[in-house]
Amino acid sequence: KVHGSLARAGK
């Protein structure tokens, strides 16, 4: 999913 990408960059 897309949220995985932002989650990795966010943390």
From Swiss-Prot:
The organism's place on the tree of life at top rank: Eukaryota
Ribonucleoprotein among keywords: yes
Keyword Transmembrane attached: no
Keywords of the record: Antibiotic, Antimicrobial, Ribonucleoprotein, Ribosomal protein
Gene Ontology biological process terms in this record: defense response to Gram-positive bacterium
GO cellular component: ribonucleoprotein complex; ribosome
Function: Has antibacterial activity against Gram-positive bacteria.
Family stated for the protein in its record: Belongs to the eukaryotic ribosomal protein eS30 family.
Name by which UniProt lists this protein: Small ribosomal subunit protein eS30
Species this protein is from: Oncorhynchus mykiss
Gene: fau
